């Protein structure tokens, strides 16, 4: 008799592990072993079970002998499938248990495990074994053999695709016989089967998931909170091969691929991109109740940091935020986020301050009793517009909010007014959309302030209907410094159509020349001399000023 190739299945209880064992038992080339380490586990831990004495009398209790003779002993078939429960991997077992054979991990959402487990045995964190599952995954990765991870939910919804993917990972051929079995027990069942395997014995294959879940027992809520993070760690390594389970949309490509692995500040901690989330009870989710700023980093310095913070805190005060973090706390969060990411140039920060988490859903700020939520999202992001060749604008039918309704001087996150205009520009492949005020005069674009030049005079709309941008104010100062005439007044759309030069301003895009509006070519269709002069002056200002980032050293 030859030594079979051993396949190790590691899981928590109530994770369809027995159904999967039955599946492998249908293969003509595979023998299965049901929890060979169980007796060793019961003897070492002293855990009580209704069948404890029977297990100890009928199974090998010596862990070393189990590994040597039961798991890796000789056999009559090509493969030996060993079903393991993760908590049964105790310290002191021979190292070859993990170093030999092929391993995979089967996971299931604790939200589904706990109601099922409770029907047979009181659950606990140790009994679930999710911590040990993470440890098993880590140990195998450390050995250079990261295991495949499959999710029981996928196994239920699309058994064939999931099993084919698992067989590919294990480098064994898939067999269609794995999809069905006869109802009733099999000879390989452990002696505990009458307590745990009732539903499997009634099945003839992987049952489809129930349309609606069981009511979750609130007595296990704390256990769920402790267990879910561990489940999510393992779930992030599942390969979603099933078309029924994967997103109907293809994975999007990021504008800057390096941003796939950024770190963001949320609340009071720095988190990886996919973990950087706010509560569903946060005000920004409940009603866009938040203020924000955009900042840009140039060669180790944050440009106009103090001015942006002034506006952030003014906006928070205008919205009557309570328990606002101190200015120095916000600065430290910005610095720590940038330093942790190693972002010292070509970086844009989206700085948000929400009213915070609510005790219950609803718009009333009276429900906000946790204090504000601070978010620092730093990304590698060059200017988003074509500042060399110029951009095209269209005029939106959506009018800019009147201060009678919502004052644009509050830099708030409720951007639907702007987004509706942006949709119009997207539909025409324009960079942005000009927004008019209620009387038909130009206010700004959906994302930027706007300037024009006519007969040597620089004009920009007054700020009654637009956000008085930090970049706008900076450029207005540069206009005067460069000895151009500056006029701030109401400007009609036709004046922009017939301007000699037009540009937009904003932290995200800096100074962006406009070469066409609503199909009308601006000037000669090229970047004008006033625009270029101010672009150069702005660039020099970003090089010469800004708040230094601690620890930054020039290359």
Swiss-Prot record:
<dbReference type="Pfam" id="PF19798">
    <property type="entry name" value="Sulfotransfer_5"/>
</dbReference>
<dbReference type="InterPro" id="IPR001544">
    <property type="entry name" value="Aminotrans_IV"/>
</dbReference>
<dbReference type="GO" id="GO:0003824">
    <property type="term" value="F:catalytic activity"/>
</dbReference>
<dbReference type="InterPro" id="IPR027417">
    <property type="entry name" value="P-loop_NTPase"/>
</dbReference>
<dbReference type="InterPro" id="IPR036038">
    <property type="entry name" value="Aminotransferase-like"/>
</dbReference>
<protein>
    <recommendedName>
        <fullName>Branched-chain-amino-acid aminotransferase-like protein 1</fullName>
    </recommendedName>
</protein>
<dbReference type="InterPro" id="IPR043131">
    <property type="entry name" value="BCAT-like_N"/>
</dbReference>
<dbReference type="InterPro" id="IPR043132">
    <property type="entry name" value="BCAT-like_C"/>
</dbReference>
<dbReference type="Pfam" id="PF01063">
    <property type="entry name" value="Aminotran_4"/>
</dbReference>
<comment type="similarity">
    <text>Belongs to the class-IV pyridoxal-phosphate-dependent aminotransferase family.</text>
</comment>
<dbReference type="InterPro" id="IPR050571">
    <property type="entry name" value="Class-IV_PLP-Dep_Aminotrnsfr"/>
</dbReference>
<dbReference type="GO" id="GO:0046394">
    <property type="term" value="P:carboxylic acid biosynthetic process"/>
</dbReference>
